[in-house]
C-alpha cells in the first residue's frame, strides 16, 4: 500500500456537514484495509483566489495509507460531491503523523495569545 496526503476544500455553506464527510471518506479508506495516519480539520480559511465566487472555504487534511482502488473510490467521491470545491492527492514516501505547519502555527498563535490575555487581567486589577 502507498502513502498519500489528501487535502480537500469544502464550500463554506456546507461546513456543518464536514464531520459527516470526513467519516464517509475515512470509511472508504478503512473498508479496503487502509489506514488514516493523520487527520486535521483546518476550519474555515481565506482562499488565495475565489473559486465559484467563494472567498472562504473549509479545509481538511488527511494522511492515508491505501491501495489504488481505495484512492480511486475516494477521488470519485470527491468529484461527485458538489460541496467539495477542490481536492489534491499527493503521493508521499512514508506515513506522516506529525502536526502540519498549519496546525503548528495555529497552536503557537493560541499559546502566545493566551498569556497575553492573562497578563492583561492583573493590570486591570491594579488600576482599579
From Swiss-Prot:
Residues of the region (Disordered) are: 97-128
Q: Would you name any one GO CC term?
A: cytosolic small ribosomal subunit
InterPro entries annotated for this entry?
Ribosomal_bS6, Ribosomal_bS6_sf, Ribosomal_S6_plastid/chlpt, Transl_elong_EF1B/ribsomal_bS6
Which biological process annotations from GO are given for this protein? translation
Compositional bias, Basic and acidic residues, is annotated for 118-128
Alphabetized GO MF terms: small ribosomal subunit rRNA binding; structural constituent of ribosome
Instruction: Print the keywords alphabetically.
Output: Ribonucleoprotein, Ribosomal protein, RNA-binding, rRNA-binding
Q: Does the keyword Nuclease apply?
A: no
Superkingdom of origin: Bacteria
Q: Does the keyword Transferase apply?
A: no
Q: Which HAMAP family does the annotation name?
A: Ribosomal_bS6
Enumerate the NCBIfam families for this protein.
S6
The similarity comment for this entry is: Belongs to the bacterial ribosomal protein bS6 family.
Q: What does this protein do?
A: Binds together with bS18 to 16S ribosomal RNA.
Its protein name is Small ribosomal subunit protein bS6
Amino acid at each position: 500500500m502507498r502513502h498519500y496526503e489528501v487535502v480537500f476544500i469544502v464550500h463554506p455553506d456546507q461546513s456543518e456537514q464536514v464531520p459527516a464527510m470526513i467519516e464517509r471518506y475515512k470509511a472508504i479508506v478503512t473498508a479496503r484495509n487502509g489506514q488514516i495516519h493523520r487527520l486535521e480539520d483546518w476550519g474555515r480559511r481565506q482562499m488565495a483566489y475565489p473559486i465559484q465566487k467563494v472567498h472562504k472555504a473549509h479545509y481538511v487534511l488527511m494522511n492515508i495509507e491505501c491501495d489504488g482502488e481505495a484512492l480511486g473510490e475516494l477521488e470519485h467521491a470527491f468529484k461527485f460531491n458538489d460541496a467539495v470545491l477542490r481536492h489534491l492527492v499527493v503521493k508521499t514516501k512514508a506515513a506522516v503523523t506529525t502536526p502540519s505547519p498549519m496546525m503548528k502555527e495555529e497552536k503557537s498563535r493560541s499559546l502566545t495569545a493566551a498569556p497575553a490575555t492573562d497578563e492583561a487581567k492583573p493590570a486591570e486589577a491594579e488600576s482599579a
